[in-house]
Amino acid sequence: VGLMDAQGRQIVQSSRSEPSFIGTMPRTLRSMFQRFPRGSWRPGDVVISNDGYLGTGHLNDVTMVTPVFRGEKLIAFIGSIFHTVDIGGAPSVEARDSYEEGLTIPICKIVREGVENEDVIAFLTDNLRAPDDTLGDIRAQFAAYRQAEHRLLKILEEEGIDDLDGLAGELLERSDASMRQAIRVLPDGLYRDEIKLDGFDAPLTIKCGIKIEGDRIEIDYAGTLSLIHI
């Protein structure tokens, strides 16, 4: 579970979260903003997607996000990513593209203003081998959002804070400064390495280049295959 400010910048995440999930959630939320601009979100909405090309991961990693309002003002977003036991598709290691791997859920509102979208629910469950298990996972996220929203609003009330704008800015500035300080300790230069894997059809090579310059670091994987069969 992660907490983003009203701009979609992640400021809090569970210490037990997968690093890959922590990193992809803000990117997925930015994609959601293209489909649903921030002004179109309403209290009780939940937006869902598992489209890996938008940042979620592979198809079994489902991202959902809900807005948090204080009065009429949008103050935050709460999101989570969960790995569903089944997402449809052919149970075969011979899958060559995402269409064979399972169902891609486009960005859509699975809950509108607190009411489950029965059409989206039916579309999902009718394409799954374990619909009850997956639907249980989805509704567990709904419950987590309600609890997180309740606790967030309670903290704001207790501390006399209207929104997260100032707090989010301070947290992000401190995080940025801390990371830049850690980078400055490293010698400037360009560092390259590669690892070789057995692969599935043929051996694979993953290449990585790291450029350090002052308080900046750039990482690229030039020379690594973009799409592979695993």
Across the structure, where does each feature detected by a protein language model lie?
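Conserved mixed alpha/beta core segments that line enzyme active sites in large multi-domain catalysts
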Residues: 9, 13, 25-67, 192-196, ...
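A short, polar/charged loop-to-alpha-helix boundary motif
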Residues: 19-32, 85-94
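A short, hydrophobic, proline-anchored segment that marks a local hinge/packing element in signaling
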Residues: 61-71, 79, 211
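Accessory "access/gating" subregions that flank catalytic or transport cores
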Residues: 150-226
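Conserved small/polar residues in nucleotide/adenosyl-binding loops
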Residues: 228-230
